[in-house]
């Protein structure tokens, strides 16, 4: 079978300084002073594995739940028990919230058979905290620590022949870039370092990043490398074009990009 990748669009949200995620229409406007953010976990399927890259917000938004992620997977013929591996770019709750749920009144793994691949240093950082955001999220990560099939990644790691992970920092201290390469696909998922299509043509240092200058350096480097190797960039927070490729570079306009269609071949 041919390998394939698709975004699992989870919704668009208005996010204010309180970091609460309120659902809005895809073509709607964020509240005054808030950011408009879309969420797109990614599904990658090959002959041996069914892989998720990040898992959405789960129940940690206002009126959100893991059901949307399950429904998106079902549209592609995938059940929760068929997911073999989950790779996390970083451990912010809008990226990891779909890992577990309380639909039956107690915590359960959303993907019981999946190996959960996380940065070893990032997991140690989270577990060392007395509180992870709030009481509910602290309970959530403690449950994952006890019950998930955790597999820890070093700063430079290659858990499978087709998957390479590198520590890039920037947005968070131990943020990771995930490269996927086989005969059919060439992918880069850089989490919130390249979160949208437009960011490859913006040179900026964001105050919300752990290390804004590191994010800027890595964004420039990764965009250049993706262009050189012809990788499709997976943009987790893009509302319109979450998979795109850099096809050219113009001295005046910067990178020229084109959308990439996901889904089964």
Question: For the regions a protein language model found, what residue spans apply to each?
Answer:
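Short, electropositive alpha-helical surface patch
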Residues: 175, 243-262
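Core dinuclear metal-dependent hydrolase active-site scaffold
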Residues: 1-10, 41-45, 51, 155-183
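Active-site metal-binding motif and surrounding structural segment of the metallo-beta-lactamase
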Residues: 65-117
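Zn-dependent metallo-beta-lactamase
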Residues: 1-48, 57, 221, 249, ...
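Metallo-beta-lactamase
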Residues: 58, 74-75, 110-167, 214-230, ...
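Histidine-centered divalent metal-coordination motifs
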Residues: 87-95, 171, 175, 237
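Residue-level marker for buried hydrophobic side chains located in beta-strands
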Residues: 51-53, 87, 116, 187-189
């Amino acid at each position: 079978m041919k390998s394939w990748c698709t975004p699992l669009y989870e919704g668009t949200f208005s996010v204010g300084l309180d970091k609460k995620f309120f659902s809005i229409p895809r073509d709607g406007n964020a509240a005054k002073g808030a950011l408009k953010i879309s969420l797109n976990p990614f599904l990658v399927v090959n002959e041996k594995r069914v892989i998720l890259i990040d898992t959405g917000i789960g129940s940690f938004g206002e009126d959100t739940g893991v059901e949307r992620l399950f429904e998106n997977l079902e549209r592609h013929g995938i059940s929760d028990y068929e997911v073999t591996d989950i790779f996390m770019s970083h451990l912010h709750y809008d990226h990891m919230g779909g890992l577990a749920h309380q639909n039956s009144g107690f915590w359960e793994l959303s993907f019981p058979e999946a190996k959960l691949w996380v940065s070893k240093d990032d997991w140690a950082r989270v577990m060392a905290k007395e509180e992870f955001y709030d009481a509910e999220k602290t309970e959530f990560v403690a449950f994952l620590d006890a019950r998930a099939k955790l597999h820890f990644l070093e700063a430079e790691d290659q858990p499978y022949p087709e998957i390479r992970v590198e520590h890039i920092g920037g947005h968070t201290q131990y943020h990771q870039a995930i490269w996927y390469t086989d005969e059919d696909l060439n992918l880069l998922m850089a989490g919130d370092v390249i979160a949208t299509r437009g960011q490859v043509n913006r040179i900026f240092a964001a105050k919300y990043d752990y290390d804004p200058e590191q994010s800027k350096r890595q964004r420039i480097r990764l965009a250049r490398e993706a262009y050189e190797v012809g990788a499709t960039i997976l943009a987790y927070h893009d509302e319109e074009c979450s998979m795109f490729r850099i096809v050219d570079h113009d001295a005046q306009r910067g990178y020229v990009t084109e959308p990439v269609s996901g889904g089964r071949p």
